[in-house]
Amino acid sequence: MESASDGGRPRIRNLRCRRGLMPSAGAKIWDENGEVVIGSDEGTKKALGALDTMNTEGLLLKTTIMEPALYDAINKKQVATFCIGAFWDEFMRKNCEATKGDWRVMSAPEFEGVNKAGAPVSQYMGIIEKGDNPYSELFRMMWYDFTFDGAAKEEWVKSMEEQNAPYSNPVSKELLQSDFWKEPSDFYGGMSFREMEGKCLENGAENLVVTPQDAEADEIISAELENYVAGNQTMDEAIANMDKNLKAKIGKAEIVK
């Protein structure tokens, strides 16, 4: 269970549900017209029903993300699985040396009837061509060099690994064919983390639709998940309250196309 600290009380983040469980289950918060459908959506019931099952069966560790309490739990081997993005590798290598060699990587589990892995996320950069912009061409050169120069990319990755710092796989499929991107990792017991990162992007689910109201919606949904985790309501009640409060506080969302 991912949470953030708030004055000593954990606050549940809906972010991982939005990027992981919900897309994998084909869930929807809004329909194609921006109307709230989370209360009647079968995908939502699948996604949050899975969360409910894991919680009811005592399979979730309730702690704070990216803080010492979680790393201590990992090093004490109280955590067996993370459903999380590849970025988490950096924090594991940096803070959980005691578990080196114990971990393995796999694609996100698929929901029956949906058969899609987790939804991939991307990073975008943009150049605003407005007036005199003397560095736009330099930026383009740097970006292409960083993205497609295999030797330079490999040198950078080695440096980042030595620092236990984050790095990303190239977007070039040609570069990914290099043996470098299939090298085994001691931290993962000889499995190639780099290769698995690429494989785990295969058969990805579609991301949820994007709206300008998403930040507010996340707060509403997260509040109901918090009440559920606190034992104040069932998951069915939580979903019903999400639906009711989204309709009352936001109403119709603007769909970004």
Spans of features found by a protein language model:
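Bilobed periplasmic-binding protein-like "clamshell/Venus-flytrap" ligand-binding domains
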Residues: 1-11, 148-161, 248-257
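Extracytoplasmic/periplasmic solute-binding protein
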Residues: 1-36, 43, 79
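Glycine-centered hinge/linker elements that transmit conformational signals in sensory
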Residues: 33-64
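Short helix-initiation/N-cap motifs at beta->coil->alpha
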Residues: 62-76
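Beta->alpha turn/N-cap motifs
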Residues: 67, 84-90, 121-123
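Alpha-to-beta junction loops
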Residues: 76-85
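C-terminal lobe and pocket-closing loops
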Residues: 92-99, 113-121, 125-219
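A structural supersecondary motif
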Residues: 101-112
